[in-house]
Regions:
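Acidic beta-to-alpha connecting loop that harbors the catalytic carboxylate
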Residues: 83, 233-236, 287-289
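Bacterial Sec-dependent N-terminal signal peptides
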Residues: 1-32
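A domain-start/cap signature at the N-terminus of enzymes
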Residues: 23-76, 86-89, 131, 135, ...
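Serine-hydrolase catalytic machinery in alpha/beta-hydrolase-like enzymes
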Residues: 53-63, 73-160
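Short, surface-exposed basic-aromatic patches at helix termini and helix-loop junctions that form
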Residues: 95-100, 177-184, 300-308
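C-terminal catalytic histidine-bearing segment of alpha/beta-hydrolase fold enzymes
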Residues: 264-310
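The feature captures the conserved acid-bearing segment of alpha/beta-hydrolase catalytic domains
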Residues: 186-272
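Short beta-to-alpha linker loops that shape the active-site pocket of alpha/beta-hydrolase fold enzymes
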Residues: 109-113, 194, 288
Length: 310
């Protein structure tokens, strides 16, 4: 694989270590496995990204896991962390799947220093101080730009990527699907989100599309997206401390499992109302609760099936 540095990435911290894979590493343990070397090394790595101009003053760290694979056609999947902003843990949770399916794991960490709350991360920075921000400043834009950087570095020649997010990351991912143009995404997997922006206009943004930037005539292309809702069947705790309990959120269901199903059924109903083709899918994972490590193998399998069908 021809891996080279590229001059336009302003700030880059290169990291690597050759270690055995593990799914339960803590943030500190994975950091210990990282040492300075070339861009996107084998095993664990990280780099600092600030090359998207509208957000260049708000750099983020991107963690990676590269399996033992030397061809330049390695598939890429973005893995989005939850509200704890622990991207390195998420990368560790995906290491075994990376080796099994030979996929590059890319885990951006949307840090609290520059993106301090759910409005900046889970909601994509769309709506701050009671007003919509400029679309070019939405954090959704980081994904395609990081992917372009990886392509330009000659790490891979693939033209598309997958994206998965768990919990708060699932919130980011389903809004990424609704409010950005994910033309390079081959599969979009929101998993175990705490609450949703529903794909209808009966609720006001951010709980629905009423008063949002998404016009109803755009729903046709949104319902054609390769979106797969992935839910842990045991993610049913109505008293979870981090579960949003506003009236609008409670109308979606009493726990994450119910809310995920509601997100799917309301979108399907809206598509039927408008006589639109509906490509979204929903899958449940037995014996798994609110756990990224528990959901990762099923998400990786869904991504691999997408690769096999293309």
């Amino acid at each position: 694989m021809n891996i080279k540095h590229f001059k336009y990435l302003r700030v880059i911290i290169i990291t690597m270590v050759i270690v055995s894979t593990g799914c339960e590493d803590s943030n500190e343990k994975i950091e210990e496995k990282i040492a300075n070397t070339s861009f996107i090394p084998f095993k664990y790595g990280k780099f600092e990204y600030n090359d998207y101009e509208p957000l260049s003053d708000k750099p983020i760290t991107v963690y990676t896991y590269m399996p033992d694979y030397t061809n330049d056609d390695i598939p890429v999947i973005f893995v989005m962390h939850g509200q704890n902003r622990d991207a390195s843990n998420y990368c560790g949770d995906w290491a075994t799947s990376a080796e099994k399916y030979k996929i590059l794991i890319v885990c951006p960490e949307i840090n609290e220093l520059y993106y301090p709350n759910s409005q900046y991360y889970q909601q994509g920075g769309m709506f701050i101080d009671n007003k919509f921000t400029e679309p070019e400043k939405w954090t959704f834009n980081l994904i395609d730009n990081i992917f372009s950087t990886i392509q330009d570095s000659n790490v891979t020649k693939v033209k598309t990527y997958g994206i998965y997010g768990h919990s708060g990351g699932g919130q980011f991912v389903h809004r990424f699907a609704l409010f950005s143009e994910p033309k390079n995404a081959s599969i979009i997997i929101p998993s175990n989100s705490g609450w949703y922006t529903l794909a209808h206009y009966k609720e006001t943004f951010p709980y629905g599309l009423n008063n949002s930037p998404l016009n109803e005539n755009i729903l046709k292309e949104k319902f054609l997206l390769p979106l797969v809702i992935l839910l842990g069947e045991n993610d049913t705790d109505p008293n979870s401390a981090s579960l949003r309990k506003t009236d609008e959120a409670m109308r979606q269901g009493s726990h994450r499992y119910a809310r995920g199903k509601y997100f799917y059924t309301t979108a399907k109903s809206k598509a039927e109302e408008l006589s639109l083709q509906f490509n979204w899918k929903i899958f449940t994972v037995p014996n798994v609760g609110h756990s990224n490590a528990g959901m990762a193998p099923s998400a990786a399998e869904q991504f691999y099936k997408t690769l096999s069908n293309n």
